[in-house]
């Protein structure tokens, strides 16, 4: 008799995706982040659902509804901080997941990669709208500054901004629609994740060598389920440490002041996971130029498969490319630091140099080094 997990119409989909899935025998811990992202998404949807039961999306009551959740709702403080710090965990896993794809050449699975880039944009949009909901000072001014960037679009810019705002400034209409979209997007993201996995399972996983591993595959369960559970425990431990010991470490103290349109905070800055892009935006002294650079800093991921010049897929056996990759990682950390600093000397020039280096590495140096390594190996 056939096992039910192989014959049942629904269970056989689960079986072929998570149980009997053939996986390369050599994939390292860098391949854990996909499953961790799935857990993060589930956690965010769950905590978000319970928060939405107590939250009100009206400018007069939004801030007080969040304090009510923290003070009066059973374990409301825990729900709120799990949701806020869960977003940070989500982005840590996202950036490591993308970094893994860059290092090991996983971007050559173009459909999976492009779907992943669209997912990254969707998650960033969701996180931005979520940051507006507590209606603190940084929520309000962050929303004002970032949405106002669209006014740099020639001809239609101003109309577009007022259309998004639902008025002539960030107000009730803006908060209500941001809440609606913030609630809706994670479910759309869940559907997109399924498409991402569908594309991945068409080709199978890449591995650290970058060489096809069809001759040496092992079942996903129990080998990688147990490996993923270890990663999960480590992430949950880090998240709980953050939530229970330093819940506000990654937040902005300004957001504990109710939104006040008449009082601008001295330093408007987004959450830490957007600081690198914010630094690139600020490094260009022109509004439209800054907006284009901001979009390009993420959209550049789409063209990475086109910039692959090496005859080897992975960077495992390419030491010069490895140096360049880690230079890029250090550059992104530098940009993240600069994004949180005031606009004054020497931060301005450091940010400009780091921004130039970011695009230079990806567009010019990586492809050239790939060609050079081919030549060194006499290919």
From Swiss-Prot:
GO terms for cellular component: mitochondrial inner membrane; respiratory chain complex III. PROSITE patterns: CYTB_CTER, CYTB_NTER. Pfam families: Cytochrom_B_C, Cytochrome_B. GO terms for biological process: mitochondrial electron transport, ubiquinol to cytochrome c. Coiled coil: none annotated. It is a multi-pass membrane protein. Component of the ubiquinol-cytochrome c reductase complex (complex III or cytochrome b-c1 complex) that is part of the mitochondrial respiratory chain. The b-c1 complex mediates electron transfer from ubiquinol to cytochrome c. Contributes to the generation of a proton gradient across the mitochondrial membrane that is then used for ATP synthesis. Belongs to the cytochrome b family. This is Cytochrome b. It comes from Eptesicus fuscus (Big brown bat).
